[in-house]
Regions:
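N-terminal glycine-/serine-/threonine-rich beta1-alpha1-beta2 phosphate-ribose binding loop
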Residues: 1-90
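Conserved active-site and cofactor/substrate-binding residues in soluble primary-metabolism enzymes
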Residues: 7, 11, 15, 35, ...
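General beta-strand structural signal in soluble alpha/beta enzymes
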Residues: 55-56, 73, 96-98, 121-125, ...
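Rossmann-like NAD(P)H-binding beta-loop-alpha module
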Residues: 68, 115-196, 203
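Rossmann-fold NAD(P)-binding glycine/threonine-rich loop
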Residues: 81-87, 91, 98-138
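Catalytic, metal-anchored helix/loop core of enzyme active sites in primary metabolism
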Residues: 146-150, 158-161, 165, 177, ...
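Substrate-binding/catalytic subdomain of NAD(P)-dependent oxidoreductase enzymes
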Residues: 175-271, 276-278
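A conserved regulatory-domain signal marking ACT and ACT-like small-molecule sensing domains
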Residues: 309-402
Length: 402
């Protein structure tokens, strides 16, 4: 029997304990050993919890117990979680986490420490919730050279954009609705400003390209600038608006950014609506591989965490090879130099737009505004043309017909 500890009994932590309990026989069959929760660490009291006897308030009890071989860290944040993770790895315990902030900021350090101690640091649930994307990228696609990753990585923003598109809701109303349904936090900043998506694309990019991509190096734009008019014009032009995290190999460097994009309404990602997530990974042998599913939620995320627990149990004496080196600003390419078509909304006349941009595709029925799609050009060129007297109210890349 394998003894484990769960650090944190919030939404994900309680889901993990629930899945381990309710699916115990299935987990035993897949892991080859019984998996027993010995401790749940939380400073709060849960007097009515059926697992009340398992609670501990002192981390030292857990880290010093030689019976505990796998620790699940679902505290969140990068403060106490970092300290606890380091201590557990140093003590020779494998760690499983859903903590995207911790992996995005400290992944290279923690993977190196796990390697030195001969244990595992696993984080399938840190990206995509219940969607299996880390393991396929790290194992099933290792014969490929990855050239690009892009996707809808945040369910909150995708729900808001879907509500705006379908129901004509203003951004503020769509956000309020998302909060009422529990899809958005009371402070939604990390979601709507793109920080959550940034952390996730950093993790995927670090794994795919082999060196740590730090969130601070990634230009990040959220969805607060997307308007109802943008939604209407995009639809008229044959597109939907989605917030994407995107990374692309540029020679020996990697270009990574987060921003709203117009995606072709007939593309796969255009069909990923509401709180669903979708990720596309392009390999030079396999082509495009698409992963879609529930990107958040108690049980979908717990499902991914428990899958990693099973993996850790099966590899107690054989380390899984998941690693990347530390990163450097020298390895990051500026996305402003990436070429694409662009959607622009302005109050400039069609004549002025055509004078500066040449042949463009205009949206119909835009009233006093002008909305158009440019030919393919990089962001630097777009800025130069706009500086000739065209004020852009919105400026989004076109993903293309992927």
């Amino acid at each position: 029997m394998i003894k484990i500890a769960v650090l944190g009994y919030g939404i994900v932590g309680s889901g993990v304990v629930h899945v381990l309990d309710k699916n115990a026989e299935r987990i035993y069959k897949n892991a080859g050993q019984r998996v027993d929760v010995k401790y749940i660490l939380d400073i709060r009291d849960f007097p009515d919890c059926p697992y009340n006897s398992l609670f501990a308030k002192d981390f030292e009890t857990i880290v010093s117990d030689p019976e505990v071989t796998v620790v699940v860290e679902v505290i969140g944040g990068a403060d106490a979680a970092l300290t606890y993770t380091r201590r557990c790895l140093e003590a020779g315990k494998s760690v499983v986490t859903s903590n995207k902030e911790l992996v995005a900021e400290h992944g290279s350090e923690l993977l190196k420490l796990a390697m030195e101690k001969g244990v595992n640091y696993l984080f399938e649930a840190s990206v995509g919730g219940g969607i299996p994307v880390i393991r396929p990228l790290a194992q099933c696609m290792t014969a490929n050279t990855i050239s690009e990753i892009y996707g809808i990585l945040n369910g909150t923003t995708n729900y808001i954009l879907t509500d705006m598109e379908r129901n004509g809701a203003e951004f503020s109303a769509a956000l309020f609705e998302a909060q009422n349904k529990g899809y958005a936090e009371s402070d939604p900043t990390a979601d709507i400003e793109g920080h959550d998506t940034c952390r996730k694309i950093c993790i995927l990019s670090s794994l795919a390209f082999g060196h740590h991509i730090y969130p601070r190096s990634v230009p990040t734009e959220g969805i607060t600038g997307v308007t109802i008019n943008d939604m209407r014009y995009a639809a008229a032009l044959g597109y939907k608006i989605k917030l994407l995290g995107r990374s692309r190999a540029v020679g020996e460097k990697v270009s990574v950014y987060v921003a709203p994009h117009l995606v072709n309404k007939h593309s796969i990602l255009a069909e990923v609506d509401d709180v669903m997530n979708g990720v596309v990974i392009r390999g030079n042998a396999v082509g495009n591989v698409v992963f879609c599913g529930a990107g958040a939620g108690k049980l979908p995320t717990a499902s991914a965490v428990v899958a990693d627990v099973i993996d850790a149990v099966k590899h107690l004496y054989a380390r899984k090879w998941i690693s990347w080196t530390d990163g450097s600003e020298d390895l990051i390419a500026d996305p402003v130099l990436l070429a694409s078509a662009w959607y622009i909304r302005t109050d400039a006349s069609c004549e002025k737009v055509e004078k500066e941009f040449g042949s463009v595709l205009f949206a119909d029925d835009t009233g006093s505004e002008t909305a158009f799609v440019t030919s393919v050009m990089n962001g630097k060129m777009v800025s130069e043309l706009l500086n000739r007297g065209i004020k852009a109210y919105s400026q989004f890349r076109i993903l293309g017909d992927h």
